[in-house]
Structures are given as C-alpha cells and as structure tokens.
Amino acid sequence: MAVHKEVNFVAYLLIVLGMFLYVDAKACTRECGNLGFGICPRSEGSPLNPICINCCSGYKGCNYYNSFGKFICEGESDPKRPNACTFNCDPNIAYSRCPRSQGKSLIYPTGCTTCCTGYKGCYYFGKDGKFVCEGESDEPKANMYPVM
C-alpha cells in the first residue's frame, strides 16, 4: 500500500512540474507601451484579388507569386529598416505568402501593446517612427489592465 502512495505522489509531482514547464514563465508587466505602430508581415492577396507591391518593397521572409502560383521573388525590405523603393506595382505579382498569415499587417493604434505582449514576428515602432523592438509573445496575451 505504501508503494502505491509513493507512486501516486511521484506521478502527481511530475504532473505539477510539467504544468510549470508548460506555462510561460515570463510575465508581462501591466504598464502600457508608448508605441506608435506595429508592422506584421502577413500573407496578402490572391490570384483573383492581386496586391500592389514590388520585390524591393516586399518584406524579407515573404514570398511573392504570380496569379498562376509561380514564384516571383522573396521580399527584399527589412521592416526594421525599410528599403528606399519606388512604390510601383509589379504586374507579375498577385499575392504573397508570409510565415505568419493571421491578423493585421499594420497595427495602429497599438493601444496598450508593449514589446512583451506584442507578437513575435511583428516589429514595433515609436511615435517618432524609429524601430523599438520585435514582439516577444508567441500568442497574443489578454490585456488584463485596459487603458482607462
């Protein structure tokens, strides 16, 4: 009987420790950020609803395709330091595919977003337009303390 109690205790302990490892140990503070806007490279457009962009101004990490699905190029512009490109549309590009495809591409206003609560893969800028940080959260965290 004592062996069963020890086994149960060890199993319970492993489950509790596993839960602590699974939970994100990093807690974000409740202060609001002073961010101006955020850019999150996202998939856009489709063969039937093409986008207006060119390879120079397309985001690094995003691939651009024509309406038949043929690869045209990878974006060349780093959201942290955008290229000085013309804003001419490349008529060959119909749509993009980026690693993160959900949510908005431009976050404005940022509300109470901080670098800690912002999405990984999104780039946040101050009100002066200068790069501040990349988001640190794998998933959006609920804002428990909304701006009053």
Curated annotation (Swiss-Prot):
Coiled coil: none
Pfam families registered for this protein in UniProt: Prot_inhib_II
InterPro entries: Prot_inh_I20, Protease_inhibitor_I20
Compartment(s): Secreted
Intrachain disulfide bonds: C28-C116, C32-C112, C40-C122, C52-C89, C55-C73, C56-C85, C62-C98, C115-C133
Free-text function comment from the UniProt entry: Potent inhibitor of both trypsin and chymotrypsin.
Protein name listed in UniProt: Wound-induced proteinase inhibitor 2
